[in-house]
Every structure is written in C-alpha cells, then in structure tokens.
Amino acid sequence: MRLALWTLALVAIAGTPLRAQQVTLGAGYALADYREQADFLHFTGSGPTAMVSVERGRLALRVDAWHLGLDPENNAAPALEPFTLDQLNVRLGVRAMSVVGIEAGYMKRWVDPSRAAQSFSAATLGVRAAYPLAPGAEVAVRTAYVAGTDFTGGGSAPFGIELGLSAYGPGSGRFRVTGDYEFQRIDRRTYQTGGRLSVPIQSSLARVGLTVRF
C-alpha cells in the first residue's frame, strides 16, 4: 500500500508541466540481501520497484521507491521472523562537468513489524558519473556518504556509505532496459551496560527494469 501511494505521487510529480524538461518513469523488480551484526541477522527477499526522474538543464531530481518481502536465511539466528521493507530515496543532482554530478539526498526506510529490523532516515551527499557507451546506452557509478542517521531503535552512526552501479541499454524509441546494483553499509553503534556495542547494518539490492522517457 505504501509503495502504491508513493508511485501515484511520483506520477503526479512527473505530470507537472515544465518547459524543456525530460521526465523518465520506470518500474522493475529487485532481489535484496539484508544483514545486521554480520550474519547474525541475515535476510533475503525480493519485491517491486518504481522510479521517476525529472531533468532540466544541469539539474536532475530522482525519486526511487521499493517494497520488499524479506525472510531469514538458514544461517541466521533462530527465532527470526520475516518482515516487509519499504524504502524511499530522493536525490537532487547538479551536473558539475560533462559526465560528473554532485548529489544531495534523503532516504527513509520503514520496516513492518518494527521489532524485526531497524527503520531509519538519513541524509546523503555524494557524486555520480555517467559514461556513454553507445547511442542510447550508458553506464553510471555513484558513491555517497550517509549522515544524520536517525534509528527507531536508538543508537548513532558516525559513518555510512552507499555505492551504486547502473547500466542503461539501448531501447526501442522511448523505452530502455535498465539494470543496477546498490550497496549500503551503516556503522550503527549502541550503548548497553556502560559499553559501546557495534551493530552495523548492511544491505544490497540488484534490480532490472524498464523505463520510458517523455
């Protein structure tokens, strides 16, 4: 339900008239891997994804959303329960050079049931580089620092990083096939009985999809 609402909002944004803009809508399917405390809490799963991007001149706004169903892996701790993960990513980029841009963003993650894993929000700041391979095809790499993380279960994260690799294949007319991989690690820390406990959160997402540009 939450993903459907965000998808409707993305379509509404994309439908707003703006001279000389390029709008891209996309949908896909993703495979995901989620871990807390290394292999102690290990989940895998999959689910649908949606995206919209609006480009105007040197500016680019991109919004991604996904809804994942995650189940415990066999090597995970006992008594773990499956959960759903909804995530929203918003990134605003400015092209600084022909192929390199600077991006600032915000991300929000919801987990249900909340006791199964951490929900959080955070800000991101990074760079993105896109390299054309052929007419209508390109590859892009992205890295970002994750800051200001606010966890529902408490704790802090002095360091977090995102890495991304995307490929856009030549398509037919306005349509293109896409594939991308995202990796995120957040070094969460909590304090118990007077001592500091390291509980890192690590996730990866591989997805394929189809986009249409207007």
Regions found by a protein language model. Name each.
Residues 29-35, 56-58, 65-71, 106-112, ...:
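Transmembrane beta-strands of outer-membrane beta-barrel pores
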Residues 165-170, 200-214:
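Outer-membrane beta-barrel "beta-signal"
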Residues 18-75, 88, 205-207, 211-213:
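Short glycine/proline- and aromatic-enriched beta-strand/turn motifs that initiate or cap beta-hairpins
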Residues 64-126:
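Outer-membrane pore/translocation modules
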Residues 55-59, 95-100, 132-136, 170-172:
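Outer-membrane beta-barrel channels and translocator barrels
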